[in-house]
Amino acid sequence: MPLRLEIKRKLAQRSERVKSVDLHPTEPWILASLYSGTLCIWNYQTQVMAKSFEVTELPVRSAKFVARKQWVVAGADDMYIRVYNYNTMDKVKVFEAHSDYIRCVAVHPTLPYVLSSSDDMLIKLWDWEKGWACTQIFEGHSHYVMQVTFNPKDTNTFASASLDRTIKIWNLGSPDPNFTLDAHQKGVNCVDYFTGGDKPYLITGSDDHTAKVWDYQTKSCVQTLEGHTHNVSAVCFHPELPIIITGSEDGTVRIWHATTYRLENTLNYGLERVWAIGYIKSSRRVVIGYDEGTIMVKLGREIPVASMDNTGKIIWAKHNEIQTANIKSIGADYEVTDGERLPLSVKELGTCDLYPQSLKHNPNGRFVVVCGDGEYIIYTALAWRNRSFGSGLEFVWSSEGECAVRESSSKIKIFSKNFQEKRSIRPTFSAEKIFGGTLLAMCSSDFICFYDWAECRLIQRIDVTVKNLYWADSGDLVAIASDTSFYILKFNRDLVTSHFDSGRPTEEEGVEDAFEVLHENDERVRTGIWVGDCFIYNNSSWKLNYCVGGEVTTMYHLDRPMYLLGYLASQSRVFLVDKEFNVIGYTLLLSLIEYKTLVMRGDLDKASEILPTIPKDQHNSVAHFLESRGMIEDALEIATDPDYRFELAIQLGRLEIAQEIAVEVQSESKWKQLGELAMSSGKLQMAEECMKYAMDLSGLLLLYSSLGDAEGVTKLATLAKEQGKNNVAFLCLFMLGKLEDCLQLLVESNRIPEAALMARSYLPSKVSEIVALWRKDLSKVNSKAAESLADPEEYSNLFEDWQVALSVEAKAVETRGVYTGAKDYPSHADKSSMTLVEAFRNLQVEEEESLENGDMDHEEVVAEENGNEQRNEDDVAEHVEEHHEEKEAEEEEGIVDGDSTDGAVLVNGSEADEEWGTNNEGNPSA
């Protein structure tokens, strides 16, 4: 029966003719040496060229990674070997190695050796720890030496293939070959060793269009592989799969079964002749070099063939070898750490007659079924004895121990617990997959049908593309995984039973409401298991998650691909296995799962009884779960993390609890958040305290100003000044009427122009003092601009109502320290829009009216006022006449006044030059 290997193309890159290929053991890189003389490193994950080296203008026929040194070593037709550091791109070494074309280089797996073979019929050994000295020469071939390769089972020996039609086996340290195989009728192009431990085989490819498998112990030909129509240029035994791969100049790659030597598959990607095949251990990736580019394919799935029963006994298959280990064999004194490999004692259990592609325990763990090569064999788990066998593409167990076999897409057989055939089913559709469990499931490409095991009656058809299916042990829940998401369904067993008991006919789609969709999650499930009502799975990002009631929790981020084996309740751990069969455990408390399950079922009383058994360090996980269920009060009681409890308290509006947490944590952001919430909730005392802790001075300003708290504003002004919050300090002082302090603050903050403007508006008596400071400060930058500043004491005519402003200041200083209460607002509301100058003028009018009402002798007042008015009129007339004369003089001299110079002030009869103005000559000033 065929292997049915799934083959996926992972990379396709066109290029010049590819003469050799190699895979990096740790990086996602392919090394290709080209006939054009270039080395290319392709990243097969990103599908782009990562690096390239221009080696020579002649063909580079062979190149290999030396990962432990971060090197690439290459041999070319110019007879030189070159070594590059692929990280720094530096050339490490260049030396002439042969007297003719270099056909192949091979790197020793552990020692600092490189073998090279050439058209000069020689093989040379190079030691890079001795400065790339040639430590040995192997002579014996009578034609070109096309390839050399080390024996992976004995790295002291190597094989060479030559166009003299022979294969020679050599020992390092001996110049003569151990023996020679007359391999083919024409030249031998390639040779490779079998990597498994059970067969002393090697394979050769020749210009006679055949590949041959040899036993190098008996020196006999085991098998000849015929089918290619041109020279066989590349061969390999796959290190992980039981297959042989051959490539030919006929453009095809053929895959052969390594045991039966049957042709399994033929690949033809239309890139002309095949020249090279590359692979690495522990990977199912194979890279192929063609005339027109490079192809990488992935053969089969990389999921390890392993199974664990409910007692912790693990059985896995390495090729045809079956091994076992028991988790419980680890001593109780050993402290298991999450994510670390378990030190299991591995034992050989036996071998399998077919190549295992799947392996699974039955529900009680007594039997193990192995599937592969289109057959299945049932073994006893303890002694590994053959219990039953047969033909089948797939094999599944029922939850009761029965089983089903899919022999083809149109025939499924069901067997009893004793492996006796019960019935045969021929579905009305093409069954591409089957799944076991509580019900028997059959899938086509776009739907799945569930049947009962007893009579194979249709339960329900569901239109979904199914990749995998996982049943809970209870049989009430099932997870259906597709390529992009998974669904949790509830199986209504009682409804189905009552339907069949009633004798009602079943519809074409099955029993209505047999399944109820509970949850859908947009994550791809790689592997999964059920523990109670908890579904544990790892996703496409290799996160280990579990899902209870639709709420997904990430347990761990896996650092490499791992696959779920099972769960042991006695250890509260879930176990996984990687591709190298390392077993790793992670803690998942059963009490935690039970608690979440009970909450989902609404049994809160029983859940509260289990809560004390959950360790404190898991309480936050419980709280997050409760929050997702809308049980925020319960989450607040259980949560232990202060930050999380604070957020929950804020959600609930429990400000007192939030305040206690804030006192404990002393986080400025928390105090600020709590202060804003307290303010909006009307808890002003709490808001004040929070804002003080948070140093939220702006918030305190809003609070104190809203409350009319002069004492608070006074303290805030001092605090703001200490903290350097000058804006807040200024507003506080201004609200308190401490204008001199405001002015001083502006000066100290080096805001002298603003201080001058404020003094002009509120403290005109201080203007001269501030202008002097301004001139002094500005003169350091622009002396002309400093000279242009006008002092109102010197040029009062340029400042409207200057004398009135001085009088207003003297009058206003009496009321500045008086803070009117909020209750008096109505009597002051009408005056709020009146300026001080207007108020002063109104005051003058009121005084005049009071004088007219008899406070003084009317005639004396009138006489005095007339005298004053006369003097004022004379002064005004004199001032107007002087101003008129000055204006005429200015017009004669061509001087423009201040109003016509965009506000520039005249000093000593000339316009002051400003930084952005013009000089006296009309040119732009510096």
Swiss-Prot record:
PROSITE patterns: WD_REPEATS_2, WD_REPEATS_REGION. Pfam families: B-prop_COPA_B_2nd, TPR_COPA_B, WD40. WD repeats lie at residues 13-52, 55-94, 97-136, 140-180, 183-224, 227-266, 269-309, 351-390, 461-501. CDD domains: Coatomer_WDAD_beta-like (cd22947), WD40 (cd00200). One of its GO terms (molecular function) is structural molecule activity. It is a peripheral membrane protein. One of its GO terms (biological process) is intracellular protein transport. Residues 888-900 have a biased composition (Acidic residues). The keyword Repeat applies. Keywords: Cytoplasm, Cytoplasmic vesicle, ER-Golgi transport, Golgi apparatus, Membrane, Protein transport, Repeat, Transport, WD repeat. Residues 868-887 have a biased composition (Basic and acidic residues). Residues 847-926 are annotated as: Disordered. Residues 917-926 have a biased composition (Polar residues). It is found in: Cytoplasm; Golgi apparatus membrane; Cytoplasmic vesicle, COPI-coated vesicle membrane. InterPro entries: Beta-prop_COPA/B_2nd, Coatomer_complex_subunit, COPB2, G-protein_beta_WD-40_rep, TPR_COPA_B, WD40/YVTN_repeat-like_dom_sf, WD40_repeat_dom_sf, WD40_rpt. GO terms for cellular component: COPI-coated vesicle membrane; Golgi membrane; membrane coat. Gene3D superfamilies: 1.25.40.470, YVTN repeat-like/Quinoprotein amine dehydrogenase. Oligomeric complex that consists of at least the alpha, beta, beta', gamma, delta, epsilon and zeta subunits. Belongs to the WD repeat COPB2 family. The coatomer is a cytosolic protein complex that binds to dilysine motifs and reversibly associates with Golgi non-clathrin-coated vesicles, which further mediate biosynthetic protein transport from the ER, via the Golgi up to the trans Golgi network. Coatomer complex is required for budding from Golgi membranes, and is essential for the retrograde Golgi-to-ER transport of dilysine-tagged proteins. This is Coatomer subunit beta'-2. It comes from Arabidopsis thaliana.
